């Protein structure tokens, strides 16, 4: 089984992934948590190239690097884990590519889908949790500021995060369009809700859709 989490940086994906991972371990459900880009030796090196702010990368180059990292992760780790009955929890998958490179970088969608199919080996998530938040709120959360304007050191941002608010507004709209087209796969969550409440909604969705999670209890 493949469970994916999506959302712009600052939405709280990492928090929810940690909570889910801890719960599955406690319930003795075999699981593995991975991230994109990354997850293999080669993919982690690609991650460094993609996120280091000193690198200038063209939109197509960025797409191909993300896709190369994904292909390594899917073939070497994710598919073998799923074949062994392991539940895979993945921080970002191809929906990020559609939102970031397709909507944010405005890369042709037909070309995008071809590359996604190749890099994923046609693998689809069983369920995707999307944490929705505005870019403004995400940035405030990231730097623990209470109101705009936000004062911060841009050197603290990675290359993707420095793309600007307009870019992330496009990315967010991309995600919302993706959800509209794939409503059965997605669970839409308000990232500004209480983290524990979000966690409970995630578990409720898993229990509702998949019998393997029916015995899980949350506090």
Curated annotation (Swiss-Prot):
Keywords in alphabetical order: ATP-binding, Kinase, Nucleotide biosynthesis, Nucleotide-binding, Transferase
Entry's Gene Ontology BP terms: dTDP biosynthetic process; dTTP biosynthetic process; dUDP biosynthetic process
Key word Disulfide bond present: no
GO MF annotation list: ATP binding; dTMP kinase activity
Entry-linked InterPro entries: P-loop_NTPase (IPR027417), Thymidylate_kin-like_dom (IPR039430), Thymidylate_kin_CS (IPR018095), Thymidylate_kinase (IPR018094)
Catalysed reaction equations from the record: dTMP + ATP = dTDP + ADP
Keyword Transferase among UniProt keywords: yes
Residue spans crossing the bilayer: none
Leading EC class: transferase
Protein residues bound to ATP: 7-14
Any Pfam family matching the protein: Thymidylate_kin
A cellular component annotation (GO) from this entry: cytosol
EC annotation from Swiss-Prot or TrEMBL: 2.7.4.9
HAMAP family: Thymidylate_kinase
Task performed by this protein: Phosphorylation of dTMP to form dTDP in both de novo and salvage pathways of dTTP synthesis.
UniProt record similarity statement: Belongs to the thymidylate kinase family.
PANTHER family, sorted: THYMIDYLATE KINASE, UMP-CMP KINASE 2, MITOCHONDRIAL
Protein name, UniProt field: Thymidylate kinase
Encoding gene per record: tmk
